Amino acid sequence: MSASETPSASASRGLSYRDAGVDIEAGDALVDRIKPFAKRTLREGVLGGIGGFGALFEISKKYQEPVLVSGTDGVGTKLKLAFALNRHDTVGQDLVAMSVNDILVQGAEPLFFLDYFACGKLDVDTAATVIKGIAQGCELAGCALIGGETAEMPSMYPAGEYDLAGFAVGAVEKRKIIDGTTIACGDVVLGLASSGAHSNGYSLVRKIIEVSRPDLNADFHGQRLQDAIMAPTRIYVKPLLALIDKLPVKGMAHITGGGLVENVPRVLPEGVTAVLHQDAWTLPPLFQWLQKAGNVADDEMHRVFNCGIGMIVIVSAADAPAAIAHLKDAGETVYQIGEIRARQPGEAQTIVI
């Protein structure tokens, strides 16, 4: 409907989907833009291409007793910063990382990924940038971007905003599922460095920014502060799958919402406690800034942010040196940050001292 056209005149000529706010041509243009990104993620097992009603994937015959492991997640309020900063190149990797790192914890190899992109009005350039990041995340994880959904829903979202959700499916041999049941006193807790705040705690990050009003373009340890804040979530899949093939990994924990103190207990058996030593690694500059700018207590930091540790790996004391060497050779920064001991009455299952 033109600016001079009345609603009744528009109705008399016949309404279209575009009149309702849905641009089919824009959706088609987006599909054409993202096909090359998805194609680069193809791997063994993918049957067919983008555009079918369902996405097909054949489980490799290398698995004798495959168990499917699935995970779904979003990016949370980190998206609000993406909108404010008009930078959409990192949140796609965030989306993939949140799900593939979760299923990795149980020993699963990520096989394929699907995404959901919802907006009020589709901006092809923005959506293509986001989905390119999703595809790049899939490449890092070794999984195929096998399908997805783009939903343009007028009046559902403010102008310039969108929401993301993702879904990963992986497989693990039934006898190789990592469930934490073999964790015992004397085992060693290794911490793999995070790339930043990943995709958790951003409601607090945004509040700290609101209160402290920093210059997000200011230099921050060799980069802009906004670059440190928006750094994409690290994907640990390939180094850890290789480690699992090399030696017995007893347990892993993806450090997401709830931080170290709430995520590590999720993989521990009854009767043991993980004792983590905060002097075993240096709190990265971003978290030092967040704590100082927001006057955030230590306990709050540990239950909101990853504090520089994005993944926990638990191995026997005998296997710890080999595990550390392997992970370092794979390009990971790894710290020996704690140990497993008997749990005392009334004690939390993870303590930071």
From Swiss-Prot:
InterPro entries with a match to the protein in the record: PurM-like_C_dom, PurM-like_C_sf, PurM-like_N, PurM-like_N_sf, PurM_cligase
Catalysed reactions listed for this entry: 2-formamido-N(1)-(5-O-phospho-beta-D-ribosyl)acetamidine + ATP = 5-amino-1-(5-phospho-beta-D-ribosyl)imidazole + ADP + phosphate + H(+)
UniProt GO MF annotations: ATP binding; phosphoribosylamine-glycine ligase activity; phosphoribosylformylglycinamidine cyclo-ligase activity
Record key words, sorted: ATP-binding, Cytoplasm, Ligase, Nucleotide-binding, Purine biosynthesis
Compartment annotation: Cytoplasm
Primary localization class, coarse: cytoplasm
Enzyme kind, highest EC tier: ligase
Annotated Gene Ontology cellular component terms: cytosol
Record GO biological process: 'de novo' IMP biosynthetic process; adenine biosynthetic process
Any one Pfam family match given in the protein's UniProt record, by short name: AIRS_C
SUPFAM superfamilies: PurM C-terminal domain-like, PurM N-terminal domain-like
E.C. numbers: 6.3.3.1
Biological pathway: Purine metabolism; IMP biosynthesis via de novo pathway; 5-amino-1-(5-phospho-D-ribosyl)imidazole from N(2)-formyl-N(1)-(5-phospho-D-ribosyl)glycinamide: step 2/2
PANTHER family membership: TRIFUNCTIONAL PURINE BIOSYNTHETIC PROTEIN ADENOSINE-3, TRIFUNCTIONAL PURINE BIOSYNTHETIC PROTEIN ADENOSINE-3-RELATED
Family, as annotated: Belongs to the AIR synthase family.
NCBIfam families reported for this sequence: purM (TIGR00878)
Name recorded for this polypeptide: Phosphoribosylformylglycinamidine cyclo-ligase
Organism listed in the record: Ralstonia nicotianae (strain ATCC BAA-1114 / GMI1000)
